[in-house]
Amino acid sequence: MANLKFLLCLFLICVSLSRSSASRPMFPNADGIKRGRMMIEAEEVLKASMEKLMERGFNESMRLSPGGPDPRHH
């Protein structure tokens, strides 16, 4: 009986492995031909963000000054 269970288990594993190799590819749009609308919009947002960053520069601080000394500092 144990031998039969082992053979059945081995058979099911072999069948599942053979079916997974014949399935469709995991990333059908990997070649870049068809892209989704969300992906295109994300690329546009990223491009606009990079352009804004390049205009402003990398070394400029985005912090705002509080307008005076902080009395609670030190």
From Swiss-Prot:
InterPro entries: CLE1-4
Effect on the protein of changing R63 to K/N: No impact on proteolysis
GO terms for biological process, alphabetical: cell-cell signaling involved in cell fate commitment
GO molecular function: receptor serine/threonine kinase binding
Residues modified as Hydroxyproline: P66, P69
Residues making up the signal peptide according to the UniProt record: 1-22
Plastid among keywords: no
Gene Ontology CC, one term: apoplast
Residue positions the entry lists as glycosylated: N59, P69
Keywords attached to this entry: Developmental protein, Differentiation, Glycoprotein, Hydroxylation, Secreted, Signal
Lineage top rank: taxon: Eukaryota
Family designation: Belongs to the CLV3/ESR signal peptide family.
Name of the protein in its database record: CLAVATA3/ESR (CLE)-related protein 1
Source organism: Arabidopsis thaliana (Mouse-ear cress)
